[in-house]
A protein has these predicted regions:
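Exposed regions on extracellular, virion, or secretory-pathway luminal proteins
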Residues: 227, 576, 584, 952, ...
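C-terminal motif of bacterial Sec signal peptides marking the signal peptidase cleavage site
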Residues: 18-21
């Protein structure tokens, strides 16, 4: 078969696919190409919807296929037809290290009662892990092998299996959540949905070689997918990071026991979702490189660009391991012609599921589909389109409605074929083309490869493990990466104490390979005799855990509120020592976030990814948000310098290599425990020395402060769960001033300006909440109408900044309270809200009371905590009043049969798609504007729809019906005449009748 370049491939593939019948010839007379290898892949229906967000997508017609050679004319064999019988699916094959076994995921129908395993029905209707064993077959024979079903889930889904080395078993992704469902926030037990409130979360699990001892090893709040084992024995996988505005897949690594989890690449690099990562040949010229397909979060059928990632030398595209490596160069496209890694048309096609060969050839097996669209309903090659037609497909200024009216649509089936790609020669050899209505993906070479090293187990503290606790130590929060996300740029002049020109003293790095021009001068910052000691801004670390969205409940969207954040719980506080270190015990196997807090209880940063530690694990990090590969800043001579102005009783006990936090907690183990309040007393400064002053004592308690006037007079949160109606609204109604003259609700009752009363708005929430979190529309001075703009094909209303900022940006930027204009007004400081927020919400007039003195210390702490967490309406979904309740009468089967087709027709093709984030392109529609995410996944769409229902007894009052039956919808479609889903229409009535079935009275 002729080898093609990508340019000629794009033009020739249409005719190649037309020859698919010839390519499927199973005769013995095959074309043999030097270097051919046997391979396996999956055949799947093109009716399936594949997105990174959909971890268990399925459609009838899928099977595992083995092809005898990597040649288009070689024989192929359907291995699983006896189980699927045309009504099942297969995915995610992986080959054993000796090349003689295949582990894969298969969903075969429970209606198949003829296929058995150990005398029991083999098929459960759910995704399970299977193994096909060829080891007993003659060489060159691929049929007649034996099957093992390793898992037997009847209510869970197990996918993405891979072999662990040394016969240790398997790693796989599963939504069974064996531990996390028993250990949810506030003592609850339930299956967690992802952070779109759609699908049950897929986490990494391991099991032994016989399918036993299933253990959950990852605890992300959205999917962990595509695990494989690296040559060093680590597990590498794609992690969906979806905390606040961050919404992408990065490449992570972890040991098989779940310890030492950290990002490997892609948390802050161009592009959105790095999926299907695999190591290139460790003995070839690409040793240390990882191949991945980089794609958008939706609308590309999991296809994107083929990326070669220099993971050995870069932690991000612009973060080299040392200064001898170019500053930028962590990733590059492997193909000569660039493929589109974003949404829209990709002129040269898309790639998915790459598999690099480790045979010295440096070739990559992959699935590729050409650029095809439909024109007047007929599939055509993009090469046949005019320049204007191509431009229209990629015109971001067009609305979805305008694009839907075009005869040319980017909706052709994803007909992936299997290719052998040679990156050195830039040639493509077609290996297998699917029959009509199907795709081929997930190719793997059936050849032996070196077995990875067995990763050594991490030593754990048995005492901590028995308590289901772990330990985290950060050597210095000031040891940040080149993006300076915990550096001077995060501070405002108001943060600087009197006499300080900067908050963080800096110096040139002592490490000659360091890539940073300046680093924090920790020796000065921990010296009480130096002015830098009193200028350092970090005072506390706040530990937070996720409150996962429960499955099978309604009302979650209303309960969460106008925010990009999910619900969260504050676990407690610990001090940050003068050198920037902290050391604390935290719950194990729990999704955690850590925020560094200033002296007034406001976070410097938003921690937009979840971290975890296993029971008994002692986890040490060099710094915060720092994927650098260099040595720790707080080490060597720096960490071992004990300034003379420190108390001798402490400095004399210092041991080599100890941070100040390690020293303190060794001498006082109780300091390892989180406290419920941010309180501080300087134990370090030896004030008996001339010119040495201690840092001021801090007490930010809810109650019990030295001055009772600083205590809360309103209800305090319980167990770190802050609910706006219960804890924030009472602040506005608390009597203040003489005779209550300065009570907030005395003045702020104007709906046009600011209304802080506790009346209920049209959203079902308190008016004051919506007033604080939703900015007013920007009005065109000429027309007097709201200004609109197109975002991701959707017309949206342009709004002024809200008083409370709930958009984090995906780059771990400033804390929410510090970016909120409400904070600046009530603290009397200019922080990081910005000029546009100031213009929209100017300082109160001079005739008004001094707003900076209206709230006391505890009230300001509470308000800052609520804003930093994301401004949720409720953080406890199980509290009375949240509106969240379990609903069993609105079943998924009825939804899939009756409701989903209506939504797919009227809603899913437009704005209701997952929108990703990356470092280059704009975010697109924020989640506050796009809450109902519909991808075609029955489970996911069902979960998303339930979240939009809050009152089953009154269907018309629910967002699910109220929004699309109102004109305009979306709000920016100001010229819209007819509702998307008019009240009384057949679709509307069908949905309303389904909703009312969930009413307890029905």
């Amino acid at each position: 078969m002729k080898m093609l370049s990508l340019v000629s491939l794009a033009a020739a593939l249409t005719s190649l696919l037309a020859l698919a019948g010839c390519l499927q010839n199973n005769g013995a007379d095959t074309v043999t190409v030097n270097g051919d290898v046997p391979l396996a892949y999956v055949k799947r229906s093109t009716s399936i919807t594949m997105n990174p967000t959909d971890g268990t997508s399925s459609a009838d017609g899928g099977d595992l296929i083995i092809r005898e050679k990597s040649s288009a004319s070689a024989a192929e064999h359907n291995i699983t037809a006896q189980f699927t019988q045309g009504h099942g699916d297969a995915s995610d094959p992986e080959v054993s290290y000796d090349g003689k076994k295949i582990v894969f995921a298969m969903r075969c129908p429970a209606s198949n009662t003829t296929a058995t395993v150990n005398g029991q029905p083999a098929c459960t209707g759910r995704w399970n892990i299977w193994e096909y064993d060829l080891s007993g077959l003659p060489s060159g024979t691929f049929t007649g092998g034996s099957f093992r079903r390793l898992t037997a889930s009847t209510s869970d889904d197990d996918v993405d299996p891979a072999y662990l080395p040394n016969g240790a078993g398997f790693v796989f992704s599963s939504n069974r959540q064996t531990k996390s469902r028993l250990n949810q926030a506030n003592g609850q037990t339930y299956f967690a949905l992802d952070e779109y409130e759609r699908e049950r979360v897929l986490n990494l699990h391991t099991m032994d070689a016989n399918g036993g001892a299933i253990t959950q090893i990852s605890f992300n709040q959205s999917h962990d997918r595509n695990p494989v084992v690296r040559p060093n024995g680590d597990i590498m996988f794609a992690r969906w990071e979806h905390l606040a505005d961050r919404n992408r897949f990065a490449i992570f690594r972890v040991k098989p026991d779940g310890t030492d989890m950290f990002v490997l690449y892609g948390a802050q690099s161009p592009g959105n979702s790095f999926l299907h990562p695999r190591d290139m040949d460790p003995n070839g010229p690409y040793a240390g490189f990882v191949v991945s397909d980089l794609m958008p979060l939706s609308r590309s059928q999991e296809g994107g660009a083929l990326m070669f990632i220099d993971a050995a030398n870069y932690s991000e595209n612009n973060t080299p391991a040392n200064n001898s490596i170019p500053a930028i160069g962590g990733q590059r496209q492997a193909t000569a012609q660039a493929l589109n890694a974003d949404r829209g048309v990709s002129t040269y096609g898309r790639v998915t599921t790459p598999f690099p060969l480790w045979d010295g050839s440096n070739r990559v097996l992959l699935a590729y589909r050409p650029c095809e669209v439909t024109k007047n309903g007929v599939v055509v090659s993009c090469a046949t389109l005019t320049a204007d037609e191509m431009a229209a497909l990629n015109d971001e200024g067009m609305t979805d409605a305008q694009k839907a009216a075009s005869p040319v649509q980017d909706n052709a089936p994803a007909v992936y074929s299997i290719y052998m790609f040679d990156p050195a020669k830039q040639t493509w050899l077609i290996v297998a083309a699917p029959p009509a209505g199907f795709m081929y993906t997930d190719p793997i070479a059936l050849q032996a490869r070196p077995e990875p090293n067995a990763a050594q187990a991490t030593p754990v503290d048995a005492t901590l493990a028995a308590q289901n606790m772990a330990l985290i130590e950060v050597r210095s929060v000031y040891d940040t990466d080149g993006l300076n996300r915990m550096a001077e740029q995060m501070l405002a002049p108001a943060d600087l104490p009197a006499g300080c020109s900067k908050g963080i003293a800096t110096t040139a790095p002592t490490d000659t390979t360091d890539t940073r021009p300046l680093v924090a001068d920790l020796v000065r910052m921990k010296d009480p005799a130096d002015a830098a000691y009193g200028c350092a801004p970090a005072r506390f670390v706040r530990a937070i855990r996720a409150v996962a969205p429960p499955s099978n409940v309604m009302g979650m969207r209303t309960a969460i509120g106008e925010t990009n954040f999910e619900q969260q719980q504050i676990l407690g506080y610990a001090p940050v020592e003068p050198d920037g270190s902290f050391k604390l015990q935290v719950p194990a196997d729990t999704p955690l976030a850590l925020s560094i807090v200033d002296s007034q209880g406001r976070a410097f940063q938003t921690h937009t990814n979840w971290i975890q530690v296993r029971p008994g694990e002692r986890r040490t990090c060099d710094g915060c948000h720092s994927p650098r590969r260099g040595g720790a800043l707080n080490s060597g001579a720096i960490v071992n310098t004990m300034p003379a102005a420190l108390k001798t009783a402490l400095s004399a006990e210092h041991q080599a290599g100890e941070t100040m936090a390690a020293l303190r907690t060794r001498l006082n183990p109780s300091a390892l425990s989180l406290g419920s309040d941010p309180v501080f007393s300087d134990i370090w400064a030896d004030t008996s020395r001339p010119g040495v002053s201690a840092k001021a004592t801090l007490s930010l308690r809810y109650t019990g402060n030295p001055n009772p006037a600083d205590d809360l007079a309103t209800p305090a949160p319980t167990n770190g769960l802050i609910n706006y109606p219960d804890h924030i609204q009472p602040l506005w109604q608390r009597p203040r001033g003489t005779g209550g003259a300065n009570t907030c609700t005395n003045c702020h009752t104007d709906p046009v300006k600011l209304d802080l009363r506790n009346t209920v708005s049209g959203t079902g929430r308190l008016v004051s909440y919506d007033e604080l979190l939703i900015g007013d529309p920007v009005i065109d001075p000429v027309s007097g109408k709201p200004v609109t703009q197109i975002e991701d094909g959707v017309p949206v209303v342009v709004r002024q900044p809200a008083l409370v900022e709930t958009s984090s940006s995906m780059s771990n930027t400033a804390g929410q309270a510090r970016k909120s204009r409400l904070t600046e007004i009530l603290f009397g400081q200019t922080l990081l809200a910005g000029s546009s927020a100031l213009a929209s919400h100017p300082n109160p007039p001079g005739t008004a009371p001094d707003h900076s003195t209206m709230l006391n210390t505890a009230e300001k702490r509470l308000l800052a905590e609520w804003m930093d967490l994301g401004g949720q309406y409720y953080n406890n979904p199980f509290t009375a009043g949240s509106g969240v309740r379990v609903v069993n009468s609105l079943d998924q089967a009825t939804f899939t049969a009756q409701i989903q087709p209506i939504l797919q027709t009227t809603c899913a093709a437009g704005c209701h798609q997952a929108i990703g984030s990356d470092q280059v392109t704009s975010t697109g529609a924020s989640f506050r504007e796009n809450r109902l995410v519909l991808t075609g996944s029955p489970e996911g769409d069902y979960g998303s729809v339930l979240s939009m229902i809050s009152d089953a007894c009154h269907p018309a009052s629910n967002l699910l019906l109220m929004k699309p039956s109102t004109v305009p919808h979306p709000a920016g479609a100001t010229t819209q005449v007819n509702a998307v889903l008019p009240a009384g229409s057949t679709g509307y009535t069908t949905i309303a009748n389904w909703i009312v079935r969930g009413c307890p009275a029905q």
